[in-house]
Amino acid sequence: MHRTVTLLTVCAALAVASPAPRAQSAPDIDALLGAPFPTELVAAPTGGGFAWIASASGVQNLWVAEPPAFAARAVTAYRDDDGQWLSQPAWSADGMTLVFTRGEGPNREGASPNPAQLADGTEQGVWATPIRPQTTRETPRRLGAGNSPAPAPKGSMVAWIDRGQIWIVDLAEPEAKPARLVVARGSASSLGWSPDATRLAFASNRGTHSFIGVVTVATRELRYLDPSLDRDSNPVWSLDGTRIAFAREFAAPRPAMFAPRRTAEEPWAIRIVDVKTGAARQVWRADQGYGSVLQGLDAENQILWGAGDRLVFPWEKSGWLHLYSVAAGGGSATELTPGDGEVEHARLTPDRARVVYHANHGDIDRRHVWVARVDGGAAPSAVTKGTGIEWAPVMAETGTATAFFRSDARTPPHVAVQTGEMPARAVEGTLSAAFPTAHLVEPTPVMVTATDGQPIHAQLFLPPGLKPGERRPALIFSHGGSRRQMLLGWHYMYYYRNAYAMNQWLASRGYVVLSVNYRSGIGYGLEFREAVNFGATGGSEFQDIMGAGLYLKSRADVDPSRIGLWGGSYGGYLTAMGLSRASNLFAAGVDFHGVHDWNQGIRTFRPDYNTLEETAFARKAFESSPLASVDTWTSPVLLIHGDDDRNVSFVESINLITALRKRGVEVEQLVFPDEVHDFLRHANWVRAYQAAADFFDRRLKAKPSGSQQ
């Protein structure tokens, strides 16, 4: 008979099945997750300062740091863990106001997330706040519904997008009402002002194709530039405002989701159009083969218009995502960032003669900051190196300071600034002296061998106080994505910052933890990312998890009968794959919002996906799913899911629990009403991780005869 255990049952069980006592110095998960997490660093257009958003125990605020002291100062005063995240900060042209987005976008039913069940509901909106408020009236004011604020580079206008339409308002007029700039078909994105702030470029997505549009603000005249049957995106203005460059991906059948795509039938291209005449021409096109697919990076635009009339862009010609540049007049592309490693984030310096970026060249399981010349006239120079992790660099408008985020194995993410030739230093106020740094462990890089022979990178966390001869329970963590990579330290993404904290906490509770960078993730090149038969085309990455399990089983410090799995999203998929196909190896698992049937997972993103029209693909997709092998699933599992998940449908967990109950598998569950995929509330992360740890303690910490703990 089946047995489904609710959290009330869990709490009762804990009273009689508490784990072995732990040292009082062990860190608490609330403290680990409560450390401020900074994100979205932007440089002021004047004065040499920076701004960013930080979340501390779920409370979101906007911060600034200005020279010469560069001490952090909050410019908003939100106080609640209410799930209303801040994002997309941008400076006004005079550097005196910050605009930002508050809240998350609506789901298909038109409802914005409300995980705190606020009585009046929620709505995503664009807000503005002065960086030096003089009165309470000058605290953040709401400009209107929407997101993606784009202040003009001159004057006081700001534009943004609401439900695919462009809106605009004058920041200098406190009583001004926002107005829709133009009524246009399609869904607008990638807003970009002309240098003189008279026109606004954007991409218009029409579903099957997309255009580049330009609106003259004063007259509201709308024109589409070089329209075609293809997909145009990423418009960027020339420095003199006379031309726009953009990327063109040529019309082709929609590529399969969660399937390898190493090449495109028609390689992507860069085109330039004269805004006045409409004359357009192709200035560069990718070669056939590797790099023919446009693979993006974290940047304000995939094409950056640099000094010397050169265009900077990402290209995977070598099998690694690198930066290249080409003259706007056309010609061959020049590689700017050679070597084995991937560029992940890039921005131009204020003089546009250089690009500052982060990459994993020479240190594949970390990130460091580099600078390269736009013309490729010299080798890139490393700004940071060593055992730290540094990312998202941006240079001050003055050119005298570079700010970036930094962490290491023990020190959580914080803001750092480097001025002149001085070593980088933490920005005052972005690190807590109370954080339990000394009680964390340093993960060790290890290589494991998948069951098909593929070498796989992983990080091993050993519990403190592990003695020779002891055999501890062990856990494998699988990240989500799958386009992700776990690092040898605190992660640069919030979701995986939390996962790293969880792995540290589990190690402090006595577990050997192995974090696996399975195939189809990033950081190791195109062939690894676009792995043969991964995802819906065969689930080949499951072989990496099996190899990791066998690696742990072979270790003298691991009890082979007490190996578990945990992960979220794609990691939840791999957790479920392990339990459904190898319950003899994996004794228990915690599955956060996992994909359990690829056909359902694809339909979440493509509602028009029809398994009856794509029968062969759909059959293979199901065979690559946990539900296809649920008959051999015997190990207990904890399912955790928010019911407003827009990435992995809540029905995925409903279908799985139904199948497991029919087969008598022990299932526990934790559900968060109105919560999304990447939990918006700190309290929900804490509760979920506590439930996961309690589950593993009860399932894996009981001592089998002859074993030691």
Each PLM stretch: what is its role?
Residues 24-38, 72, 140:
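A short helix->beta-strand "capping" segment at the edge of beta-propeller domains
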Residues 53-63, 78-85, 101-127, 141-148, ...:
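A flexible loop/linker signature enriched in serine peptidases of the S9 family
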Residues 30-61:
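Beta-strand-rich domains and repeat architectures in extracellular enzymes and scaffolds
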Residues 50, 98, 158, 200, ...:
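Hydrophobic beta-strand positions that form the internal "hydrophobic ladder"
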Residues 45-46, 93-94, 153-154, 195-196, ...:
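Residue-level detector of Asp-centered blade-edge/turn motifs that repeat once per structural unit
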Residues 66-70, 130-135, 171-174, 216-220, ...:
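Short loop/turn segments that connect beta-strands within beta-propeller blades
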Residues 382, 389-709:
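Serine-hydrolase catalytic core recognition
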